[in-house]
Amino acid sequence: MIAMHYLIGLKTKDDVQMVRRRAAERGPVFDGMPGLAHKWFLVDPQDPAYGTFYLWNDPAAAVSFLQGPFFHALCQTFGRPDVLLLLPTAKTLPADTVPRAALGDFGGRLGNMPAIETLDPRSGAKIDLAFGETGKGRQFEIAYHARA
């Protein structure tokens, strides 16, 4: 299993609305995508940004995605983002759909909160995705959650 994350800065709050619409329209295409376990479409309306966080069961499927039409369309719309490939070190997924998530290095201090903890093998940085209201890290709305 590998994780993948990228973040795209948006110019205006109108762009945030466009990303929400895009997530609602395109999100279902990712449901059941071969090799993909989960994809979270993330939106930060305060500091306008669009992000994604993927969990892939099959690394070859992640490569196919990055070389395929969906990622190409994203690059045409927003420019090519810096994609982080991450190694999951711990995973506790929420039982139900949650509306919010946070990204950051929480250093295992989330208690029983559902989270995916990852390690960037290039830099050694920890990048965690915590589900729910954390009060820590960068806060996001979950615009869509695609799953296998």
Cite the ranges covered by each PLM segment.
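A common structural junction motif
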Residues: 70-79
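Short, surface-exposed coil-to-beta transition loops
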Residues: 49-51
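Short beta-strand micro-motifs enriched in acidic
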Residues: 42-44
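Long compositionally biased, domain-poor regions of proteins
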Residues: 55-60
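Short S/T/G/P-rich N-terminal loop/turn motif that feeds into the first structured element of a domain
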Residues: 1-37, 47, 61-66, 80-148
